[in-house]
Structures are given as C-alpha cells and as structure tokens.
Amino acid sequence: MNYIKILLSLALVILLNVQLSLAQQNEENFTVLGNCGMCKKRIEKAALEAGAKTAVWSQETKKITVVFDSKKVELATIKKNIAAAGHDSDEFRADDKVYESLHECCMYGRLDESKDPSDTELSENTDDGHDHDHDHEVTGVVVNESERGDLTPIAGVNVYWKGNEKNITTTNENGVFKIMHEKGLRFLVFSHADMTLDTVEVKNLHEVLMVSAKNNVLGEVVVSRRQKSNYISSLSPHRVEILTSKELFKAACCDLSESFETNASVDVVSSDAVTGSKQIQMLGLSGIYSQLTVENLPGPRGFAAPLGLNSIAGTWIESINISKGIGSVANGFENMSGQINVELKKPHNSEPLFFNVYANNMGRTDFNLNLAQKINHKWSVGLLLHDNFMYNKNMNFSDNGFRDMPIGNTFSGINRWHYENGKGIIAQFGVKYLLDDRTGGQKEFNINSDKLTTNSYGLGFRNERVEGFAKIGYVFPTNKHRSIGLQLSASNYNQASYFGLNSYDNEQTNAYANLLFQDIIGSVTHKYKVGASMQFDKYDENLARVSDYQYTIQRNEAVTGVFAEYTFSPTENFDAVLGIRQDYNNLYGWFTTPRAVLRYQPGESTTFRISSGRGQRTANIFAENLGIFASSRSITSLNSLVTGANAYELAPEVSWNTGFTVDQQFSLFGRESGISVELFHNNFQNQVVVDYENPRTVSFYNLAGKSFSNSLQAEWQFMPAPHLEARMAYRLLDVKTDFESGRLSKPLTAKHRGFMNLGYNLHSGWGFDYTLNIVGDKRLPSTAINPIAYQLPEKSNAYVTMNAQISKSFGKNKNFDIYIGGENLTNYFQKDPILAFDDPFGSYFDTNMLWGPLTGRMFYTGIRYHIK
C-alpha cells in the first residue's frame, strides 16, 4: 500500500503544478481528422467561425491548435462546429451525410463510431519512395484557390512525368488524377489552357499531392498518412497496444491462440503434451491472471478459460487491444497482469462477404465465412462462422506413440445484430455457439473399445458453449459527452472429458450485467464514470478415477459491486485516472479495488505512464490445470479440497501490480522509428500455489510467504528501407514463489526471450513476413526421486523458432489473396514431451513437463476472398 500512497501523492503534486501553469492559458490542441489542403482550409475556417481567435491545423500530425477566450466560447462549441463542417474530432463525429458530401480528395479514413479518433495513431511514411523496384501509382488533386481562399477542383488538367511526355493523364471532374510512377523520374508537369505550364517536384510517392493554382501559379501541398498494422496510442491514458487485422494477416491466425505470433507482448504456450489446449502468458504469469474480454464483455472465463482461445476465429477479429498491468475499474476486478480485449467485425461497417480456407501438411483444415448485410439505415445483421478439422492421428514428431494433437472438429459461430436510430440510441445483440469434440492419446487408441480401460491410453473432451449478449447505449443529443450504457451476457459451458482412467466433467452457468454512466464536469478537463455490476456463476464439477474415487463439487458465486472513475485531462499532454470499486462476494465478503494511471507527454515524441492497482480472482484449480488428470500424479489432500468450504477451502487470489512505461518516437534513416521500455512488478498478497515439485504428486495450497514477478521489456520499431518494417524486442523475467520446499523460480518459464519481426509489403500486392523467436532455458520441476530412466535435467535447453509467410493480392480491388507459409522452420521440437510414455498407466507417467515446441516444421497455404 505504501507505493500506492506515494503514487497518489505524486499525482497530486503533478496535478497542482500543471493546473497552476495553465491557469492563464486558453490554448488547446486536439485531434481532427482530415486529408489535404482543402481540409485544412475547411477545419480552420470552422474553428474561427465558432469563436476561436486563431486556429492552425497540421496536415502532418492531424492536430489543430486553437487559441480562444474560455469566458466567451467553450472548446466543445469549437469542436462541434468542426464536426458540422465534416471532420471527425477526438470527441465529435461528423454527420455521415456531411462527410459523404466532401470532395473526393477529402475522404479521410474514418474510425468506427464506438472508438475515439484520438485512439488512432496516424503515422507518417517519410521515405521518399523513389527507389522502388515495383510499379507505384501516384494520386493527387488540382484545385484553384480564389482570393477569398476558397478551393475548387479543376478538371481537364494534363499531367505527365517530365522526361516522358507520351504518358499523359487528365484530372477528372473532381480534380483528381492518378498516374503510374516511372523509376528515376521526380517531376510532374501540369498543363491547362487557362493556366501557365508548371513543374512540381514529387517528394514522396506515398503521399497524396494537392496542387493549388493561384494567380496561374502552381504549387504543391503534401498530405498523406497511413495507419500501422500495430501501434500504441500516445493520447490514451492507459497504454494499449492495438493489433489491427493487417497485423493478423501476417500469419495464418486460424484462431485467437495463433494471433500473437508476430507480437512480443504475449506468449502463447501449450498447456501440456496431449490435450492441444493453449494458454497465454503476460508479464511471466499464466493466462488466468489476465482478463480476456470480447468487445468489453467477459470472454471465455472460469471453466472455459483453458480452451477459450480456440473459440474465437482469427478472421472474425477486427483488432486486438493489449493492455499490460491493471485496467479500468469499469471492466471489473479480476485483471491482475493485463487485459486482452478482442474487437470483432461488426455488421454495420464490415465487408458483405469474407471467405477464408486454410490447410497445412499436418492434416488440419479451416473454413471461415463472414457475412454482413445492412437491412436499412437503422438495422444491420452479421454472421460469422468457423469450422476446424483435424484427422491426422499419426502425427507424432517425438516418436513416443502418442498423437501430438487430438483429432476431431471444432465449430463456432456468431449471429449478431446492430441497431442505430440516429437519435442517440445504439444497440448490439446476438448469440454465440461453440462445439469442440476431440480425441487424443496413443495412436492405436479406439474410443469404442479402449475408453477408460488399460487396453490403450486415450483422452477425449467434448466442450459446448452457448452465449447470448446485448449492449445498449444512449448518447444524449444535447451533450455528446453524456451517455449511459448497459452490457448484458449469459452463457452456459459444458465439458465432458476423460484422461486414461480419469474422468472430469464440469458445467458453468454465468450471468453478467454492467451499467455505466459517464459525463463531464464543466468541461472535458474533468470526466467521470460511475456504474454498478453483477456477476453470477454456478459451478458443477465431477471428477472420478476408475475403481478409486468419485467426487461431486458444487458452488454458487455471486459478486455485486459499484465503481467510480475520475479522469483529469487539463491538456492533451497529461491525464490522471483514479478509480475505485467496492464489491461483495457471497463466499469471501467485501473487498475494495483501487487503481490509478498517470500519463505525461512532455513533447509529441515522448510519453510516460505510471499505473498501479489491485486485482482479485477465485481460482478454479481443476479446470485451470487439466493436465493433472493426464498424468499419474496423485492430488494431495484431495478429499479436503473437494469437501472444503467456499472454493476448495482456498482463499481468493489477490495481487498488486505497478508499472512504468516510456515510449519514444524519433526519425532514423529519414523514416519513423520508436523505442519503448516497460517495467512491471506484480506482488501477490495471496496466491493459490500449484506445486509440481514432487514428481509423484501435485499440491494446491494458499501462499505462505512471497510470490512476485518482475518484467522488463524493450522494443525497437523502425523502417530500414522503404516498405520494410522491423520490430525487435528483448524481455527479462524474474518470477519466483515460496513453495513448501523453498523459494523457487516459476517452472517452465523462460527468463530471457528475444524477438524479431520483419514485414515487407509492396503496392503490387506482394507481402513478405518473417518472425524470429529466441527462447531461453526454463527451470523444470524436480524429478530427482524418480528412477534414473524417468529423471529430467534441472533446466531445459534454449531454442530458436522461425516463422515466415508470403502473400499476394489479386484483382482490381485487391480482394483475392493467396498465402503460403511455414512455422517452426528451424524444426526444433522437444524430444521427450511425455515422461514415462512407455508405461502410461504406471506411477511416473506425466504430460505436464512440456517446455518447448511439441511439433516440428509445418507448412500451410490458404486463400482469402472478400467483397467490399
């Protein structure tokens, strides 16, 4: 708690200093989206007409600086007038009809209405682009500027490259032209019967040119920006890394578990050597400590968490938002190491049709179909389908007789609806369904004759999940800052599974509601959110072993609470977010969740953030550790766990997370570059310790001592050449827990990791991506008391994996893609993933010692087709 007090004191000191320094200032800087010089004229004119004394909009940064008298005009009035002119700002969105009436050149890239324009990183492509080895089309607009400063397009202007007068194009009725670049040529010539011939140097092929004719003299204004495939918003108080669909297309990304292959922030590892389930790791902690949400509604959690990553298809995803450390109190109390929020494709702004088919040489096939239809100006409907087949039961790289991946089928789908009446009401609702049915174990296992016998070792699971969800919001027409929203979801998850002679079945019924109201106090300098939430879970478990034991465990857990969050934003350079929750758990009583975030941006290129707060969750020890059933380990004090009060007679897990990050942008090789450094410390007040240190048993007990994780990550992004993007990262982890046998590093967790991703994309449609991962050695749980044949070393080997993909887009609209790729091209895989595989029903059989890749080199291919 001491460092929380220090943090809050620091926040207060900074707040007072900032407030005093700005007391006499009436200058504001905020984001306004636009494209060209005509946009600049329109934006500045709208600001001045609204009462601003001066207004300067930057085409490069997409920001406007206004000076005004706050006693005479409010900043919100200026922003509203800019939006009325057709330009989205960080708070007000232009009317669709006004936007659509803008000039062709002014059609800037709009954001989804549910997002804040300030959350979009508008990044400049600063390379000159003249040394291309491929065809490139230059786009521009020719306009006439009157004495009043009004801009009107000029049609019929001849445009050609100096040095090749034969290749001539002409501006259309909107003054827009497009001409193919020819290598070595840098100057465009413009000619028209009513103006003097002139030549303009094209400084950057990637940028849209605006050529202005004033008094028969031509000049050029450069305006173009593009969005990166992944970026961090410098304006958001919370540090959120956003992975766009462009980033996801760098790899096959069949489902969510494969969507982080080109990212250094999140690790995805196999949970064990036989079930095929995967889990994420953030800040060195298991995925159970990070919060997975889908459009800010709870994602697969509780019993569904271990297999939940497979339930969301990669082609459904619009973007993934990764937030390390603590999150907003409005999203709940369970977040301890970070939050991953998945934004799915929405019917009102998605392509009408998207189809993807994927196949690899290991026998896996995936089909994906996305459909969207606008019924009328209020209603839209979408359908997202995913089907995954795996029927190669002979895949066994380690040659131990066990299938590396279970065979079977996974089907999932979403039907969703969107309603918007144009008067402030927005509603979304739909249903989700998942069915996952798979069988694994030894290659000769036959489910009809060998299930739950010693004839042959087998395992299987059938998971079914149904969810209904709704989001209803109302934005007050007279005050766009004031809104009220209601989030609802209900789900049922059912799992039936067996592992050799063990069986484990569970069922979870969940209901969730979150009511949120947000507004400002006087001005946007002071914002607040208040709300109330309810979460109910009904858990039923049945675990048994043939001729040994059978237990039934039931519990109902309900958590209700209220929350409040205040944001102080005196300028775009500073934010302070202070939040608190008060919840009541029917099993554990009252608890408080305080959280705080500070963001300070001393300049446009540097951003500092500090965060700290508390998280709490209830452990589901059996569902979260399915691998214990796929081994011969006995569960220590099993009877006490299954008959104990509350949840397994264990206390809730509680931790405090503190983080510091810095993001620095700069220019390198004449192009954009950036370095980020992250430091996070997580300290558990209580943790349910999962102890594998005795190779014959597994123990679950409350922490008696300390458990902590320290994470340091540094990442460098740069462009060494035109169209070539590079990212390099290094991460250092120090994760330790006081076990009954003493303080030890977390097993199966690499202390060191190196990462590199290269992406080379051409306008001709070719894309090349390469990812390198260097994983350091990992501590292995002790096997010292096993017979020598079944003993493992104290540490694993370090290893290197490489992935690569080549893609090509075809068609006039680039709407047909073919991609081929390979994963684990180094062909490194663990030679002994299953301990005592030769005696699966003996005393030393264990599938939980997986520290490296389970399978070797894999190749895949696929196609994508969409209609815009």
Language model features with spans:
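Short, acidic, small-residue-rich periplasmic hinge/interaction motif at the N-terminus
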Residues: 155-162, 191-194, 205-249, 287
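Short acidic/polar hinge/loop motifs at secondary-structure boundaries
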Residues: 177-180, 279, 297-324, 413
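N-terminal periplasmic accessory domains that precede
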Residues: 205-211, 256-259, 278-281, 307-313, ...
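Extracytoplasmic beta-strand/coil segments of soluble accessory domains associated
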Residues: 257-301
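Flexible loop and strand-edge segments within Gram-negative outer membrane beta-barrel domains
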Residues: 390-412, 418-484, 490-508
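Membrane-embedded beta-barrel scaffold of Gram-negative outer-membrane proteins
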Residues: 485-497, 601, 609, 648-702, ...
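C-terminal beta-signal and adjacent terminal beta-strands/loops
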Residues: 616, 685, 774-783, 808-868
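Gram-negative outer-membrane beta-barrel transporters
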Residues: 678-684, 702-783
